[in-house]
């Protein structure tokens, strides 16, 4: 088996593509994987989302929703709010409703804040349907100047200015308490935490900060839709693989990803059984997880800001938190664009132009 390794690695972190293609670290796989075959036909659109410079680089098995809007059902009930899950079922889970609940719940004197976590900036931005850094026609694009992005960022800025966000600047830039995921939901001091389902896909001991999963206190929904949209967009990652440059066994890579693709539905079934039997998930949680995966397949928002270069990732940290950073540092989106758009444009232009062969 010497020198017979497939030499591939996961694309799940969204930090290796298109960087790997730009630097010739990974191979295009159009001549390795038959995306027109029956095995891959159901995910043709997904795989086409990872075309760079005219070539496929990611063997995308399935989507991976990045964020959900987690909440505590007891808090919703005690404050006489409409359950977000019911609002979603009735297609009424909108930015207006979300904002209304956030403004009503927040009370700094009572130490209540509507939003906490590390990812609400990205999660909320993507509800407009556009990532800050996207791919169009096989090229990177900077969407900071999109009107839709400006609209949602203005909504985000207004939330922060109305003091609905927990002030991480006063807590050593950690979330409430010691920074544990879910802190504040179980104690009913936080209304919503945008976070990945991975934080809830764990033992009751690990998820107790959110509330009691077994007793039905923990629930989640997609992030709200824009009022003028008929779609719930989902910040989306990928479950997939990249092939290393000059890998000695591309056939082995092809065999592996084909097996992963064929087994994917059974993997999902096994995961759901574990969630129910080991992690105490309710039927409502299982069904909502399925719903959000379906939404991610239908309305994905893939952001490539961490997959280009360290320089862009660092710059986008500033951009991502511009309108919602706590501690008095928030700026309007207009100011953020004026200060950062040209620098982002330059990095994107260089990345598109300097693709290694």
Q: Which residues are covered by each model-predicted region?
A:
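Extracytoplasmic/periplasmic solute-binding protein
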Residues: 51-69, 77, 94-142
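Short helix-initiation/N-cap motifs at beta->coil->alpha
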Residues: 1, 92-97, 168-186
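Extracytoplasmic/periplasmic substrate-recognition and gating elements
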Residues: 209-279
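Early extracytoplasmic/lumenal segment of secretory-pathway proteins
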Residues: 1-14
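Short, solvent-exposed loop/beta-turn-alpha elements that line the ligand-binding surface or hinge
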Residues: 30-42, 87-91, 130-151, 210, ...
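Glycine-centered hinge/linker elements that transmit conformational signals in sensory
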Residues: 99-102, 137-176
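Hinge/lid segment of periplasmic solute-binding proteins
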Residues: 11-67, 96, 221
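Conserved C-terminal helix/tail region of periplasmic/extracytoplasmic solute-binding proteins
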Residues: 245-254, 262-357
């Amino acid at each position: 088996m010497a020198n017979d390794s497939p030499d591939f690695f996961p694309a799940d972190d969204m930090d290796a593509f298109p960087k790997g293609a730009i630097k010739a670290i990974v191979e295009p796989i159009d001549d390795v994987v038959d995306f027109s075959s029956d095995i891959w036909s159901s995910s043709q659109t997904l795989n086409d989302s990872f075309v760079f410079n005219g070539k496929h680089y990611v063997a995308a098995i399935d989507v991976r929703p990045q964020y959900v809007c987690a909440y505590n059902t007891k808090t919703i009930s005690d404050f006489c709010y409409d359950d977000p899950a019911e609002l979603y079922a009735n297609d009424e889970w909108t930015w207006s409703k979300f904002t209304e609940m956030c403004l009503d719940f927040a009370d700094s004197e009572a130490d209540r804040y509507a939003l906490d976590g590390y990812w609400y900036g990205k999660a909320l931005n993507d509800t407009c349907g556009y990532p800050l850094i996207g791919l169009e026609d096989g090229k990177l694009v900077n969407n900071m100047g999109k009107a839709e992005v400006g609209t949602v960022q203005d909504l985000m800025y207004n939330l922060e200015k109305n003091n609905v966000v927990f002030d991480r600047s006063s807590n050593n830039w950690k979330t409430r308490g010691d920074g544990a995921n879910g802190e504040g939901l179980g104690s009913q001091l936080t209304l919503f935490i945008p976070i990945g389902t991975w934080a809830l896909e764990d033992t009751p001991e690990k998820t107790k900060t959110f509330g009691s999963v077994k007793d039905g206190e923990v629930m989640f929904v997609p992030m709200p839709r824009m009022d003028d949209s008929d779609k719930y967009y989902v910040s989306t990652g990928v479950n997939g693989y990249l092939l290393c440059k000059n890998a000695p066994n591309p056939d082995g890579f092809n065999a592996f990803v084909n097996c992963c693709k064929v087994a994917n539905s059974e993997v999902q079934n096994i995961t759901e059984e574990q969630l129910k039997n080991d992690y105490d998930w309710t039927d409502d949680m299982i069904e909502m997880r399925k719903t959000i995966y379906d939404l991610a397949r239908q309305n994905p928002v893939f952001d490539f800001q961490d997959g280009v270069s360290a320089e862009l990732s660092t710059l986008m940290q500033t951009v991502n938190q511009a309108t919602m950073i706590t501690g008095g540092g928030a700026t309007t989106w207009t100011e953020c664009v004026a200060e950062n758009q040209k620098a982002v444009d330059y990095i994107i232009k260089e990345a598109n132009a300097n693709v290694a062969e």
